[in-house]
Amino acid sequence: MRRNILFIFILFMIGCSKEPVNIYESPEFLAMSDKEIIMGESVWVTTCFRCHMYGTMGAASVNDKAHFDKLATKGFDELYNNVITGMEGEKGVMPPKGTCYSCSDEELKFSVYYIFHLAQLVHESKQEPTSK
């Protein structure tokens, strides 16, 4: 009986110590459909763009490749939680839901993926993004 409990405890601890998957390598990011990209883009255009285009108020700018690469290593769960609850960073504050209080959880989820999608496109093209 003690062996079983010890075995279950070890499995539990292994499961808890998983390192986050880099967003750029996550299956969800790689499998985003056009509909999901458009959903994320709509939140970007109406809410995220104001701060994350140029780093206003200390926000991470999609033009800062090194910063986005560092953020990507935190994994989706931590970044999504920061969006939902808000956060205080080194250079500024992001309010809960990035001020998109009418956004659904799904819209916010794809806005996180979209901003990394956009940052990737910006880095590949070496051009500034547009809001369409």
Give the residues covered by each predicted segment:
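Solvent-exposed, acidic/flexible segments
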Residues: I37, E41, A72, Y101-L108
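Surface-exposed, polar/charged faces of alpha-helical domains
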Residues: K35, M39, N63-K70, K74-D77, ...
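Processing junctions and N-termini across compartments
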Residues: I10, S42-V45, E88, K97
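Electrostatic cytochrome c docking/interface patches
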Residues: P20-S42, M57-K70
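Disulfide-bonded cysteines in secreted/extracellular proteins and peptides
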Residues: C16, C48-C51, C100-C103
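Axial heme c-ligation environment in periplasmic c-type cytochrome domains
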Residues: N82-L108, I115-L118, H123-K132
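The canonical Cys-X-X-Cys-His
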Residues: W44-Y54, V83, S111-I115
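Post-cleavage N-terminal segment of exported redox proteins
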Residues: R2-I37, Y114-K132
